[in-house]
Amino acid sequence: MEGVFSIMKNISRSAAAVLALSSMLTCAYSCSKSSGSDDSSTAPTTQVITTEPVNLGNPMEITWLADYDLNPQSPNEERPAALAAFEDNYGGKVKYIQTSSGEMLTKLSEMLNAGEEVDMFPYDTSAVPSGVMRNQFAPLDDVYDELGMNISGLWDDMKGTIESYSYNGKHYVIPYKLSSPFMITYSRKLMQEEELADPYELYQNDQWNWDIFMEMMEKFTSKVPPLSRYGITGDFGQALLQSTGKNVVLYDGKKFSSNLSDPSIEKAELLMQDIAAKSLYNPKWKSSFPNNGATLFFASKDWSLAESNANNPDMDLMVVPFPKATDADKYCITCDINAKMLVANSKKAKGVATYIMCERYAAKDQKYLDAAKQRALTAKNSLLGTPEAFITEEQYDAIQSYLDTSKFTPANDFAYGMGEKMHSYGEYTYDTRGAMENLTTALLEPAEPVDTWEKLRDYVKPVIDKEIEAFNK
């Protein structure tokens, strides 16, 4: 791929600092710190570029409200590449206001109502449309220049994802990176012992679909008495539903509508029903791939993989995306969206946009990507020197490929942003969960009051219809 920085030609003088930013990011994770490091040969730092900063106004400080700080927590801690670029190349600063994850939205509302300064806020699914309708966030369309949207090669692969978040003709969410995909972990050794095909090879040959997935689980569990083996455990209801490529709530740019009756959604729900009815699913919580040889697949985000490897060092684990619907032409991936929101009434829109652009550069710069890979592949060892957590290079490269938007469509259903009646875990019961949680959980879990798609559909339909009506007013 042609380097994003090599193709920025004939840019205006106002974008000169952008070019310098690329130089700084390429060394942000390859130069050693000048002091305070335990290992000066590997500890990264940044290089200050002597280019005139872009004028963001005075002061150039933006206020960040979140449950985590973007700034280093100690003098010895390296700055993230995006923050280093924002500070060194643009003269920016990030002022942190701490709050808890459960209180962030409440704190934001309190600050807005009090007229207190807050500029930037973490993205989560409640931002659009709920947060926008509560006048908590502002669109970023007026600061596209500061975002670098016109720089060839910088945002090209994210433009489809960005457009999927467009609301009322405006862009409130500008994802700069995808991460943490839902995926399936399996053991190649176990597959060979059971004379089953390698799912990764099936995926590479475009044969990894629901039908093959079910056939493998049924064959695996049929060899011993029922309930002794399981086809799958972990968290996969949402990934299965979204592998259809269909949304529960549709948006045409003006109005929302229910898509609950879509045949693909019905097929996904019937598949969950079938998995539960055939006792293929083990609902008992697991934090990693089971090491007893009694489960074929483990579904989770990528956070579990390092522990799974450590607990199964001889099982040759590998990961694949969730299988696509049998009649689908493309894989749809459920993953995290990395974005920062511009808070309503902020006077620092250009500063927030410039920070987001720095995040995008950090997500694209090859030196940064190489350093991130090196960190991910560094095993964490116990005091005895045995691996406690590790990821192989093959696994890492595969995960990154599953986030490639030319091969996968990132799922985005506005239903998850339409309030607690639609998206909430409640008290983890059928009566307190949101409609989306019941759609992705109820037919899989034991002792739920519904055991068929028809009953579940009739229960969630009026909830979905009522919330859509409220948002369309």
Language-model features: where?
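Paired acidic/hydrophobic, glycine-rich loop segments that form the ligand-binding mouth/hinge
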Residues: 119-122, 295-301
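Extracytoplasmic/periplasmic substrate-recognition and gating elements
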Residues: 310-382
